[in-house]
């Protein structure tokens, strides 16, 4: 399938379509309780602010997904969000967006990207037991994916789990934090 990248702020229609994709991705799964189309539009407007990096991917001139990167630290930025229409899941478009974002970030001399990935649907083994200071690292090391949780997508793209925030979204609903060093490797 032929695709092209676009700016989310190229038109009002593109911004509305981005909000719709965001809403449809997160509606009903509990990670964003105040989500409605208006809050999704507000999120899109935040993501297209000057200091952010934000773009989408189109097929046949229709937006099928988009990605944003926002400052977190001077040289490490946060991926927020990455969303793909459900009918295009598993077809490589998320990786295409992520690869392009990493290239743009490298050009801006960003050296690391972090991503938070909530487990509010009991999608991983981290939601099976109470996480404590004693078991946190063993649970992260032995994480299992039960419901196609996105952490596995990130790992396939070179991201490593660097920690979790236990109970971030309620009891046994952690936020999984991942990170990738995107510096270009110099030949040895």
Where are these regions (language model features)?
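A structural microfeature
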Residues: 65, 163-166
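Short glycine/proline-centered loop/turn elements that form peptide/ligand docking sites
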Residues: 147-150, 167-174
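Conserved beta-strand in the GNAT
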Residues: 56, 62-70, 78-83
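Conserved acetyl-CoA-binding loop of GNAT-fold acetyltransferases
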Residues: 131-135, 154-164
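Conserved GNAT acetyl-CoA-binding A-motif
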Residues: 105-146
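Active-site rim helix/loop that mediates acceptor-substrate recognition in acyltransferases
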Residues: 22-23, 27-54, 68
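Conserved N-terminal entry element of GNAT/NAT acetyltransferase domains
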Residues: 1-16, 184-188
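Conserved acetyl-CoA-binding loop-helix of GNAT-fold acetyltransferases
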Residues: 84, 90-103, 114
